[in-house]
């Protein structure tokens, strides 16, 4: 049996301000730092060990991983960063307040933008200063690989190659793996692992900073999954994520 630990970054500054974040590189809040440290202490107390960790190129995920590994006294662990684990790109919504958008466009429209499988938000213009196409961390990519907006379907399309080419082979070789990423890149992985339908994925919300454990068979098919720690607290945190896009 293999175990895979997924963890969404701790609360970010734009989570706190209820803004669409996407690829914008915002930092953790003090609460987010403490969430990450708590996760690390919990993983250590439960006896988890890792051989390799994967994360995105956005600081809220990378710093979450730092704090987790620091609490586990495993800061030497090999870490691989990939843009493919970045959050879903929210296009022209990036930086805007979710509740304000709900007041302007209605809760239903914002829910579609936030959670539907195949409907992207309005795209950024290529020359918009919010676009990441001039960011040095993506210098090795073709401009067309850097999105101007994404739906979850698009996020799945960029996350799954990384699963197939890096995460799954590492696990099959016997390595114990943790992935510190984002709400929608984790939703993409969960959708794939659990075979969640395009319609049902709308209802899945990933809470900040709580380790999600998957137990997988030799073919990396899920046997079960669960949040570490207080299950009721995890459910409440997921419900709070769901309510962010309401007026």
UniProtKB/Swiss-Prot annotation:
SMART domains: PGAM (SM00855). One of its GO terms (molecular function) is phosphoglycerate mutase activity. This is 2,3-bisphosphoglycerate-dependent phosphoglycerate mutase. Pfam families: His_Phos_1. Gene3D superfamilies: Phosphoglycerate mutase-like. It is an enzyme of class 5 (isomerase). The active site is at residues 9, 87. Catalyzes the interconversion of 2-phosphoglycerate and 3-phosphoglycerate. HAMAP family: PGAM_GpmA. Substrate binds at residues 8-15, 21-22, 60, 87-90, 98, 114-115, 183-184. It comes from Paracidovorax citrulli (strain AAC00-1) (Acidovorax citrulli). The gene is gpmA. GO terms for biological process: gluconeogenesis; glycolytic process. Its EC number is 5.4.2.11. Belongs to the phosphoglycerate mutase family. BPG-dependent PGAM subfamily. The keyword ATP-binding does not apply. It catalyses: (2R)-2-phosphoglycerate = (2R)-3-phosphoglycerate. Homodimer.
């Amino acid at each position: 049996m293999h175990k895979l630990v997924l963890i969404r970054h701790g609360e970010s500054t734009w989570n706190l301000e209820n803004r669409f974040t996407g690829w914008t590189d915002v930092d953790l809040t003090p609460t987010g730092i403490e969430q990450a440290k708590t996760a690390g202490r919990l993983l250590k107390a439960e006896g988890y060990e890792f051989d390799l960790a994967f994360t995105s190129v956005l600081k809220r995920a990378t710093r979450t991983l730092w704090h987790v590994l620091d609490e586990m006294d495993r800061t030497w662990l090999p870490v691989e960063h990939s843009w493919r684990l970045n959050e879903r790109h929210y296009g022209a919504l990036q930086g805007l307040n979710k509740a304000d958008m709900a007041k302007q466009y209605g809760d239903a429209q914002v829910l579609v933008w936030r959670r539907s499988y195949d409907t992207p938000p309005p795209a950024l213009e290529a020359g918009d200063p919010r676009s990441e196409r001039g960011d040095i961390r993506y210098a090795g990519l073709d401009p067309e690989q850097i999105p101007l907006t994404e739906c979850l379907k698009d996020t799945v399309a960029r996350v799954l190659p990384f699963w197939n080419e890096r995460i799954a082979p590492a696990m099959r070789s016997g390595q114990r793996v943790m992935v510190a990423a984002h709400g929608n890149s984790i939703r993409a992985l969960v959708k794939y692992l659990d075979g969640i339908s395009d319609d049902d994925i709308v209802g899945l919300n990933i809470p900040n900073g709580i380790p999600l454990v998957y137990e997988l068979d030799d073919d990396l098919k899920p046997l079960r999954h669960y949040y570490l720690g207080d299950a009721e607290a995890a459910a409440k945190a997921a419900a709070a994520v769901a309510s962010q896009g309401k007026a």
